[in-house]
Protein backbone atom coordinates (compact mmCIF):
# COMPACT_ATOMS: atom_id res chain seq x y z
CA UNK A 1 0.00 0.00 0.00
CA UNK A 2 2.74 2.47 0.93
CA UNK A 3 4.62 1.66 -2.26
CA UNK A 4 1.53 2.44 -4.34
CA UNK A 5 0.84 5.65 -2.42
CA UNK A 6 4.44 6.77 -2.85
CA UNK A 7 4.39 6.01 -6.58
CA UNK A 8 0.94 7.39 -7.41
CA UNK A 9 0.60 10.28 -4.95
CA UNK A 10 4.14 11.31 -3.92
CA UNK A 11 3.21 14.77 -2.62
CA UNK A 12 0.46 13.34 -0.42
CA UNK A 13 2.90 10.67 0.75
CA UNK A 14 5.51 13.27 1.71
CA UNK A 15 3.03 15.54 3.49
CA UNK A 16 1.61 12.55 5.34
CA UNK A 17 5.09 11.42 6.35
CA UNK A 18 5.92 14.84 7.82
CA UNK A 19 2.56 15.06 9.60
CA UNK A 20 2.97 11.56 11.04
CA UNK A 21 6.49 12.39 12.23
CA UNK A 22 5.34 15.56 14.00
CA UNK A 23 2.35 13.77 15.52
CA UNK A 24 4.57 10.96 16.80
CA UNK A 25 6.90 13.50 18.41
CA UNK A 26 4.01 15.38 20.04
CA UNK A 27 2.16 12.31 21.30
CA UNK A 28 5.41 10.63 22.30
CA UNK A 29 6.39 13.66 24.36
CA UNK A 30 3.06 13.64 26.19
CA UNK A 31 3.10 9.90 26.82
CA UNK A 32 6.69 9.97 28.02
CA UNK A 33 5.85 12.78 30.44
CA UNK A 34 2.84 10.89 31.79
CA UNK A 35 4.87 7.71 32.09
CA UNK A 36 7.72 9.34 33.98
CA UNK A 37 5.59 11.42 36.34
CA UNK A 38 2.66 9.04 36.75
CA UNK A 39 3.78 5.45 36.41
CA UNK A 40 7.52 5.61 36.95
CA UNK A 41 8.40 8.66 39.07
CA UNK A 42 11.51 6.84 40.27
CA UNK A 43 12.91 7.15 36.73
CA UNK A 44 12.00 10.80 36.22
CA UNK A 45 15.03 12.23 38.02
CA UNK A 46 17.56 12.14 35.16
CA UNK A 47 15.00 13.51 32.68
CA UNK A 48 14.14 16.39 35.02
CA UNK A 49 17.82 17.10 35.59
CA UNK A 50 18.72 17.18 31.89
CA UNK A 51 16.36 18.45 29.19
CA UNK A 52 18.52 16.99 26.44
CA UNK A 53 17.94 13.47 27.79
CA UNK A 54 14.19 13.99 27.40
CA UNK A 55 14.81 15.42 23.91
CA UNK A 56 16.84 12.35 22.98
CA UNK A 57 14.01 10.05 24.06
CA UNK A 58 11.44 12.03 22.04
CA UNK A 59 13.69 11.99 18.96
CA UNK A 60 14.04 8.22 19.30
CA UNK A 61 10.24 7.98 19.19
CA UNK A 62 10.11 10.21 16.13
CA UNK A 63 12.83 8.16 14.42
CA UNK A 64 10.45 5.20 14.39
CA UNK A 65 8.32 6.96 11.75
CA UNK A 66 10.87 7.27 8.93
CA UNK A 67 12.28 3.85 9.79
CA UNK A 68 8.80 2.32 9.50
CA UNK A 69 8.10 4.14 6.22
CA UNK A 70 11.42 3.07 4.72
CA UNK A 71 10.91 -0.51 5.88
CA UNK A 72 7.34 -0.81 4.62
CA UNK A 73 8.29 0.70 1.26
CA UNK A 74 11.31 -1.60 0.91
CA UNK A 75 13.84 1.22 1.11
CA UNK A 76 15.80 0.70 4.31
CA UNK A 77 18.79 0.29 2.03
CA UNK A 78 19.19 4.09 1.96
CA UNK A 79 21.35 3.72 5.07
CA UNK A 80 23.69 1.31 3.29
CA UNK A 81 23.87 3.16 -0.04
CA UNK A 82 27.45 4.31 -0.56
CA UNK A 83 26.91 6.75 -3.41
CA UNK A 84 29.96 8.98 -3.67
CA UNK A 85 31.28 7.63 -0.36
CA UNK A 86 31.42 9.49 2.94
CA UNK A 87 34.68 11.39 2.45
CA UNK A 88 34.01 12.35 -1.16
CA UNK A 89 30.48 13.26 -0.12
CA UNK A 90 31.89 15.49 2.60
CA UNK A 91 33.95 17.24 -0.07
CA UNK A 92 30.72 17.97 -1.93
CA UNK A 93 29.34 19.38 1.32
CA UNK A 94 32.56 21.20 2.21
CA UNK A 95 30.84 24.60 2.26
CA UNK A 96 28.49 23.83 5.19
CA UNK A 97 31.20 21.71 6.84
CA UNK A 98 33.65 24.64 6.96
CA UNK A 99 30.89 27.09 7.90
CA UNK A 100 29.66 24.91 10.76
CA UNK A 101 33.17 24.14 12.00
CA UNK A 102 33.89 27.87 12.21
CA UNK A 103 30.57 28.44 13.96
CA UNK A 104 31.38 25.75 16.52
CA UNK A 105 34.82 27.26 17.13
CA UNK A 106 33.41 30.77 17.58
CA UNK A 107 30.71 29.60 19.99
CA UNK A 108 33.25 27.70 22.06
CA UNK A 109 36.14 30.16 22.04
CA UNK A 110 34.56 33.60 21.69
CA UNK A 111 30.94 33.42 22.80
CA UNK A 112 31.31 30.93 25.61
CA UNK A 113 28.98 30.36 28.57
CA UNK A 114 27.63 33.02 30.96
CA UNK A 115 30.08 34.12 33.61
CA UNK A 116 30.20 31.65 36.46
CA UNK A 117 28.30 28.91 34.60
CA UNK A 118 29.15 25.44 35.88
CA UNK A 119 30.22 22.62 33.59
CA UNK A 120 27.62 19.86 33.44
CA UNK A 121 28.26 16.34 34.69
CA UNK A 122 29.73 13.99 32.04
CA UNK A 123 26.50 11.98 31.70
CA UNK A 124 24.56 15.17 30.96
CA UNK A 125 27.07 16.21 28.29
CA UNK A 126 26.77 12.72 26.80
CA UNK A 127 22.97 13.15 26.76
CA UNK A 128 23.43 16.39 24.81
CA UNK A 129 25.54 14.76 22.10
CA UNK A 130 23.15 11.80 21.95
CA UNK A 131 20.21 14.18 21.45
CA UNK A 132 22.03 16.08 18.70
CA UNK A 133 22.84 12.83 16.89
CA UNK A 134 19.28 11.52 17.17
CA UNK A 135 17.87 14.82 15.88
CA UNK A 136 20.15 14.58 12.86
CA UNK A 137 19.41 10.91 12.31
CA UNK A 138 15.62 11.23 12.63
CA UNK A 139 15.25 14.38 10.53
CA UNK A 140 17.61 13.27 7.78
CA UNK A 141 15.99 9.84 7.59
CA UNK A 142 12.65 11.59 7.12
CA UNK A 143 13.40 14.71 5.09
CA UNK A 144 16.15 13.29 2.90
CA UNK A 145 15.69 9.51 3.03
CA UNK A 146 11.89 9.62 2.67
CA UNK A 147 10.86 13.04 1.34
CA UNK A 148 13.72 14.25 -0.88
CA UNK A 149 14.23 10.85 -2.48
CA UNK A 150 10.51 10.40 -3.15
CA UNK A 151 10.30 13.83 -4.78
CA UNK A 152 13.34 13.18 -6.97
CA UNK A 153 11.83 9.92 -8.19
CA UNK A 154 8.61 11.81 -8.96
CA UNK A 155 10.01 14.90 -10.68
CA UNK A 156 12.93 13.14 -12.40
CA UNK A 157 16.64 13.98 -12.84
CA UNK A 158 16.32 16.64 -15.52
CA UNK A 159 17.25 20.16 -14.44
CA UNK A 160 13.70 21.35 -13.76
CA UNK A 161 12.85 18.13 -11.93
CA UNK A 162 15.85 18.28 -9.61
CA UNK A 163 15.15 21.90 -8.74
CA UNK A 164 11.47 21.20 -8.07
CA UNK A 165 12.37 18.28 -5.81
CA UNK A 166 14.96 20.38 -4.03
CA UNK A 167 12.60 23.32 -3.48
CA UNK A 168 9.63 21.26 -2.29
CA UNK A 169 11.72 19.14 0.08
CA UNK A 170 13.29 22.32 1.48
CA UNK A 171 9.86 23.88 2.02
CA UNK A 172 8.66 20.78 3.86
CA UNK A 173 11.81 20.81 6.00
CA UNK A 174 11.09 24.40 6.98
CA UNK A 175 7.41 23.68 7.60
CA UNK A 176 8.32 20.79 9.86
CA UNK A 177 9.96 23.21 12.29
CA UNK A 178 6.67 25.05 12.80
CA UNK A 179 6.07 22.53 15.59
CA UNK A 180 8.29 24.77 17.73
CA UNK A 181 5.34 27.18 17.98
CA UNK A 182 4.29 25.08 20.97
CA UNK A 183 7.28 26.25 23.01
CA UNK A 184 8.86 29.32 21.33
CA UNK A 185 7.92 32.84 20.24
CA UNK A 186 6.09 32.98 16.85
CA UNK A 187 8.52 35.47 15.25
CA UNK A 188 11.50 33.33 16.15
CA UNK A 189 9.79 30.21 14.82
CA UNK A 190 8.84 31.94 11.54
CA UNK A 191 12.44 33.01 11.02
CA UNK A 192 13.62 29.50 11.88
CA UNK A 193 11.23 28.03 9.30
CA UNK A 194 12.56 30.34 6.58
CA UNK A 195 16.19 29.61 7.41
CA UNK A 196 15.66 25.86 7.68
CA UNK A 197 13.79 25.83 4.36
CA UNK A 198 16.91 27.25 2.70
CA UNK A 199 19.08 24.82 4.65
CA UNK A 200 16.80 21.98 3.55
CA UNK A 201 17.40 22.92 -0.08
CA UNK A 202 21.15 22.85 0.50
CA UNK A 203 20.99 19.47 2.23
CA UNK A 204 18.77 18.07 -0.52
CA UNK A 205 21.24 19.28 -3.16
CA UNK A 206 24.11 17.59 -1.30
CA UNK A 207 22.07 14.41 -0.95
CA UNK A 208 21.20 14.36 -4.64
CA UNK A 209 24.84 14.93 -5.56
CA UNK A 210 26.32 12.35 -3.18
CA UNK A 211 23.70 9.63 -2.72
CA UNK A 212 25.02 9.14 0.83
CA UNK A 213 22.63 9.75 3.73
CA UNK A 214 25.35 9.60 6.39
CA UNK A 215 27.01 12.72 5.00
CA UNK A 216 23.81 14.62 5.75
CA UNK A 217 23.36 13.02 9.17
CA UNK A 218 26.89 14.14 10.06
CA UNK A 219 26.37 17.70 8.78
CA UNK A 220 23.00 18.00 10.52
CA UNK A 221 24.46 16.77 13.81
CA UNK A 222 27.36 19.22 13.47
CA UNK A 223 24.87 22.02 12.77
CA UNK A 224 22.93 21.37 15.97
CA UNK A 225 26.05 20.85 18.07
CA UNK A 226 27.50 24.15 16.82
CA UNK A 227 24.28 26.03 17.58
CA UNK A 228 23.73 24.59 21.07
CA UNK A 229 27.21 23.65 22.28
CA UNK A 230 27.21 26.01 25.26
CA UNK A 231 23.76 24.81 26.33
CA UNK A 232 25.07 21.26 26.12
CA UNK A 233 28.22 21.86 28.15
CA UNK A 234 27.16 24.35 30.82
CA UNK A 235 24.33 24.98 33.27
CA UNK A 236 22.48 28.28 33.25
CA UNK A 237 22.44 28.64 29.46
CA UNK A 238 19.53 28.97 27.04
CA UNK A 239 17.30 26.00 26.25
CA UNK A 240 16.36 25.02 22.68
CA UNK A 241 13.05 26.90 22.93
CA UNK A 242 14.80 30.01 24.28
CA UNK A 243 17.36 29.91 21.47
CA UNK A 244 14.58 29.71 18.86
CA UNK A 245 12.69 32.55 20.54
CA UNK A 246 15.80 34.74 20.29
CA UNK A 247 15.97 34.50 16.49
CA UNK A 248 15.62 37.92 14.81
CA UNK A 249 15.24 39.07 11.16
CA UNK A 250 19.00 39.54 10.77
CA UNK A 251 19.28 35.75 10.73
CA UNK A 252 17.49 35.68 7.38
CA UNK A 253 20.86 36.55 5.85
CA UNK A 254 21.98 33.01 6.63
CA UNK A 255 19.16 31.73 4.40
CA UNK A 256 20.84 33.46 1.46
CA UNK A 257 24.19 31.96 2.44
CA UNK A 258 22.60 28.51 2.38
CA UNK A 259 20.96 29.06 -1.01
CA UNK A 260 24.00 30.32 -2.93
CA UNK A 261 25.91 26.99 -2.96
CA UNK A 262 22.77 25.19 -4.18
CA UNK A 263 23.21 26.86 -7.57
CA UNK A 264 26.80 25.62 -7.70
CA UNK A 265 25.97 22.08 -6.62
CA UNK A 266 23.12 21.72 -9.12
CA UNK A 267 24.84 23.33 -12.09
CA UNK A 268 24.19 21.62 -15.40
CA UNK A 269 27.57 19.90 -15.72
CA UNK A 270 26.97 17.98 -12.47
CA UNK A 271 23.39 16.88 -13.03
CA UNK A 272 24.44 13.62 -14.75
CA UNK A 273 25.82 12.55 -11.36
CA UNK A 274 22.35 12.83 -9.86
CA UNK A 275 20.90 10.38 -12.39
CA UNK A 276 23.90 8.08 -11.93
CA UNK A 277 23.74 7.91 -8.13
CA UNK A 278 20.00 7.31 -8.08
CA UNK A 279 19.73 4.89 -10.99
CA UNK A 280 17.40 7.19 -12.91
CA UNK A 281 17.32 6.66 -16.65
CA UNK A 282 16.07 10.06 -17.76
CA UNK A 283 19.10 12.01 -18.95
CA UNK A 284 19.34 15.60 -17.74
CA UNK A 285 19.26 18.57 -20.04
CA UNK A 286 22.48 19.94 -21.45
CA UNK A 287 24.07 22.78 -19.50
PLM region descriptions:
Residues 1-9:
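Short, Lys/Arg-rich, polar N-terminal cytosolic tail immediately upstream
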Residues 22-29, 98-106, 170-179, 221-232:
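Aromatic-anchored segments of alpha-helical transmembrane domains
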Residues 29, 188-247:
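Functionally important transmembrane alpha-helices
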Residues 71-77, 101-116:
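Transmembrane alpha-helix boundary signature
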Amino acid sequence: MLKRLRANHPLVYCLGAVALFLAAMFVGSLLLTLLLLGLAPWAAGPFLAEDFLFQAAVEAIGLAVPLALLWRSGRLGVFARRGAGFLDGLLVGVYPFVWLSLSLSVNLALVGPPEGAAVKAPWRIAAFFLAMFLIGLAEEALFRGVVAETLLAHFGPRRAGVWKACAVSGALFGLGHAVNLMSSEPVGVLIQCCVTAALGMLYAAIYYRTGNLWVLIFLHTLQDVAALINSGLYDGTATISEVVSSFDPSMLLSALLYLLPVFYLLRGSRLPLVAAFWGLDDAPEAA
